[in-house]
């Protein structure tokens, strides 16, 4: 799988070119719902974080990782993105069935399946994904499609972003991944510590560790975790190491918060490693940073899988869940 992750910069640049026809597809919409599960939902998390940095007065962007949103839309005519690599994700198909009738603009991000059929039947826009790859490895295509749809709100120049992504130093990133994997391999559990716009990165690392390396992890999101999770340090020494995920940006208190937390971790004898990024270079650079950090996490998780004796491609519990959920829903129909 390493070769697939190392292809990401090339794929992302290709995807930006492929999806240029979607540029601005969701501009001017005040409310946007993004329905997607697992790796397909991850791109929505990243776009939500990017909007919080570069378009705080922009559209309300709601990521739905369920059969339906927790609250129904307030107005008709909202934007809707339905992301499912296979096109058959039950939760996403159901979310689309519920939300599409009142939506003003709908985009299906998929390689095929039921979602593509629905798009053709109902005249939705489609960001067609390449087939034959693992869903979680399709992340650069998902991110490129979503970025193109909201390039204006994000302040992204697709041509400039294409050049930035294509110039990423994959060998340097591979070295970072090896260091991260070596650190995490010393512990039974990884503690992932972050704040603000680092949250989608930490969630992605958690998921990559689970799917590829079959390794449990714990997620601490600050400042909230300072009121609960941090107390586990009392019994943490030797049990877990901590990965601190920083994204510095103008006006953020997160760097100060994480600096304090890292000091406390060390007082309790817990080893730490930092993954640092910056949003000060503008939206193009930040999207490229998100892509590069996520690539590092993918490579590190594959390396960990091999160190731990697991096949990173296989996910038997997910297969069982999908099969049994389908059976359960059919029995209720």
UniProtKB/Swiss-Prot annotation:
Protein name: Bifunctional phosphoglucose/phosphomannose isomerase
Catalyzed reactions: alpha-D-glucose 6-phosphate = beta-D-fructose 6-phosphate; D-mannose 6-phosphate = D-fructose 6-phosphate
Temperature dependence: Optimum temperature is above 98 degrees Celsius.
Catalytic residues identified in the record: 211, 227, 322
Pfam families: bact-PGI_C (PF10432)
Family, similarity comment: Belongs to the PGI/PMI family.
Keywords: Carbohydrate metabolism, Isomerase
